[in-house]
Amino acid sequence: MSNKVLAGRYELFERVGEGGMSVVYKAKDKLLNRFVAIKILKPEFINDHKFIDSFRRESQAAASLSHPNIVNIYDVGREGNIHYIVMELIQGKTLSDYIKEQGPMPYPKVIALSKQIAAALAFAHKNHIIHRDVKPHNVMITPNGTAKITDFGIAKAVNAATIVDNTEGIIGSVHYFSPEQARGGYVDEKSDIYSLGIVMYEMLTGRVPFDGDNPVNIALMHINGEMIPPSKLVDGVPPALEHIILKCTDKYPVNRFASADELIEALNNLEFVSTVEGDSVLVNGKNRDE
């Protein structure tokens, strides 16, 4: 695929990533003289016309989102059997890779990244777009520490049967499913808040709360399983931060934060003091329900 030119405009270079549905290439937009990322659907999806229509529709809707914490979509196109999305090229690594390399993060870093991800979700939700697949693999971290979410709306194009696909990307999504997603039920912004809570848990502890040998077992754990509090796995977890994570991941949507903005407010209400050694220590947290 390298050196191919799409639409007479996008010259493909090296492969830079791969997910359950697609392969991502670095490319050059010869018209605007800039580098971009191009996500190309894998061949096994191109004959599902209902999926393709939904994929294009959701991608075009997501292209309307312009926010500092969202990866911009520039173009959606097709050339023969190649269906593609042209996106902002981000220098950095996925949050998934960051966690694998660094392990559990200091809680000030968890809070800073969580606020950025929540800000992206809040903006999308106000524009009536639900992500449905918030997970570390879909969050890019730039060298200056900015979090940028990708793949907005794409998960809506994937039917429920794909969770049993044998690709790592789609199976990986089950670790972040809300209980209502696991049941195949109604999904709204509170489902994204649940998934972000799981991401926060993983950033803080270095592991997901529910794991198993197959996607069905993991999905059932989201519905019925009891989550081990982060403080049982990592020393020094501030109770106020743990409270926020557990509220995000409540089994019942009505008990979660009402919106991503409310979650941001709770994170902003966490108070820190500096120690003699120069470290930040969380001393208080005021949540709306307290």
Descriptions of predicted regions:
Residues K42-S64:
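AlphaC helix of the eukaryotic protein kinase fold
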Residues H175-S274:
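C-terminal lobe helix-coil module of Hanks-type protein kinase domains
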Residues H49, P143-Y186:
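Activation segment of protein kinases
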Residues F13-G19, V24:
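Protein kinase glycine-rich loop
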Residues I117-I129:
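Protein kinase catalytic-loop region centered on the HRD/HxD motif
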Residues V76:
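Activation-segment/catalytic-loop signature of the eukaryotic protein kinase fold
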Residues L113-S114:
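Activation segment signature within eukaryotic-like protein kinase domains
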Residues G80-T94, Y98:
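Conserved short submotifs of the Hanks-type protein kinase catalytic core
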